[in-house]
Regions:
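Specific transmembrane alpha-helix
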Residues: 40-54, 115-130, 155-189, 215-233, ...
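Alpha-helical transmembrane segments and terminal signal-anchor/GPI-anchor hydrophobic tails
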Residues: 152-153, 157-158, 169-175, 184-239, ...
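Juxtamembrane helix-loop boundaries in multi-pass membrane proteins
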Residues: 72, 243-250
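Short, amphipathic, aromatic/basic-enriched membrane-interface segments that mark the entry/exit
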Residues: 4-12, 107-113, 163-167, 185-192, ...
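Hydrophobic, well-ordered secondary-structure elements that form the walls
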Residues: 241, 252, 287
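Discrete transmembrane alpha-helix packing/kink hotspots characteristic
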Residues: 252-255, 279
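Short, flexible helix-coil linker/hinge segments at the edges of structured domains or between repeats
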Residues: 93-99, 153-162
Length: 297
């Protein structure tokens, strides 16, 4: 294992911006939704990259099981919370049928919760990837392997019509693995192989999906990461922004409903995006001061 890369506060800003991008995309729903795809891709890259940094700081050890267990309670409670919200705001006759779709057991009633069970499983790859890729030659082979892996995953996402959250996971896993490899590549001082892998993965996505709106996600997320990574930023408030990002992601669907309740469904999309984002941020700040609630963020 190479010497770890020191944490840079520009990454905290990147996490915060990615959270806003997700909120923004939900306020401006379109078939293209390039902001949402880029933001989720960046979230995946950053989550994996920071996990690899954590392993490097621990001398090559990563407590996957313990970390996954810490996410179980937040996952279950958030799923229950959004299920209750769905029962309150929905007027459909089938809203009380809990197992109409068994896959909802993984995500509750809100699809954005696909991220929590995905991360619980994906963390299992951190230590094996970190230990196996220990030379420039293995780095290059791993990057080539990511491009090859993306072919069946992206094809299955586009062609098989699988139930949610499987389509999200099929895109997310290759991108998450790319983020892990980026953590190693940066420590080696060799970012070009991962940039080439991202370009290859986007090309694969374009070919196998016929130019689906998300095909650019791997390359765009890596380019944004690389640009922000190089910004010489240092400020006391930046770590707090990064720490709030995931909580904002979790809270924003509820806050979006609050905005629509207060201002009506015809509210300007930009206003609803900014208002829901700021309300979610404020909610996270307050929640993190309450010990029992802080672990849910």
């Amino acid at each position: 294992m190479k010497k770890q890369v020191q944490h840079r506060q520009s990454i905290d800003l990147a996490r915060f911006c990615a959270a806003f991008g997700v909120v923004f995309s939900h306020a401006f729903p379109t078939t293209e939704d390039w902001v949402g795809h880029l933001s989720v891709g960046l979230f995946l890259i950053l989550t994996a990259f920071l996990a690899m940094q954590s392993m490097q700081r621990a001398g090559g050890r990563y407590g996957f099981v313990a970390r996954a267990q810490k996410l179980v309670v937040p996952w279950l409670l958030w799923s229950a919370f959004f299920r209750v919200v769905d029962l309150v705001v929905s007027d459909t006759a089938d809203r009380f049928i809990l197992l109409e779709n068994p896959w909802t057991l993984l995500i509750g009633s809100s699809i954005h919760l696909w991220f929590l069970p995905f991360i619980m499983g994906a963390m299992a790859f951190v230590q094996p990837v970190g230990r196996q890729i220990n030379s420039p030659a293995r780095l290059i082979r791993a990057c080539a392997g990511l491009v090859a892996l993306s072919v069946p995953f992206f094809w299955a996402h586009d062609r098989l019509g699988l139930p949610e959250p499987l389509p999200q996971w099929l895109i997310a896993l290759p991108v998450y693995l790319l983020g892990l490899v980026m953590g190693i590549a940066q420590a080696m001082g060799r970012p070009l192989p991962t940039l080439a892998a991202a370009a290859g993965m986007s090309l694969v996505a374009y070919i196998v999906t016929g130019g689906a709106p998300w095909f650019f996600t791997p390359l765009a997320a890596v380019l944004v990461f690389e640009a922000l990574w190089r910004l010489p930023m240092q400020a006391r408030f930046l770590p707090a922004l990064g720490q709030a990002a995931f909580g904002i992601y979790l809270l924003h669907p509820f806050m979006m409903l609050v905005v629509y309740k207060l201002f009506g469904s015809g509210v300007a999309p930009m206003f609803s995006a900014v208002a829901a984002f700021l309300m979610s941020w404020a909610g996270v700040v307050v929640a993190r001061k309450i010990p029992l609630v802080a672990r849910l963020m």
